[in-house]
């Protein structure tokens, strides 16, 4: 069984991060979302419509859900970047003027220099090829954009660039985004909600704050947490009164400054500890 009793709802406009150990079912899950795989039981709904109620209309749903696989640049095949980005819109039966608009719009979203559109994609760097591949999906203007490790193999700068561009695309278009990633930092920085897969099931599905506040459970599932979360958990272990749900650097800085203000005002930053003998609280 690739997936077992998986049930969840994604609201329009959500940015959902999907995390899980290798073999947890992440990739299988996302290939069901545009009809590449058909569930053996259960149903998938998009806008309240059963994806497989009328199998002959599955192509229509595939245009609604854009899927970007890992290393999508390996799927490039056209003579020029322009033609590659235009491939999807052309298959949708759009006229040339609309195709041209979409190609340039998508290239702009991913930060691709217009001067590169008439170049062969195979002459470009790995990061630029990745942009062309992602733009080819964006040009179809899917209602739902699903990305499987879109920053895999890129250097830190390239990683930040492409994920920032996806986030900006999400903000400007209101497109629902599902991002599969092994990077807890990326999920913490870009997602609004997190779906945690474990052993083919959903282990958690909640806001970013609430999921990373359950760090011990994530660690028990063989997953990591953002480095900044580990630091704050260590501070709490040492008896320092700081929150446990810190998951981004800006939030960490804010919490540190607040703690400094409390200390400067004479407030104790020492967590109360439980006296095992008396069963009550004792100050360290």
Labelled PLM ranges:
Residues 120-124, 128:
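Conserved ABC ATPase signature
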Residues 97-115:
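Conserved ABC ATPase "signature" region
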Residues 141:
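Conserved catalytic motifs of ABC-family nucleotide-binding domains
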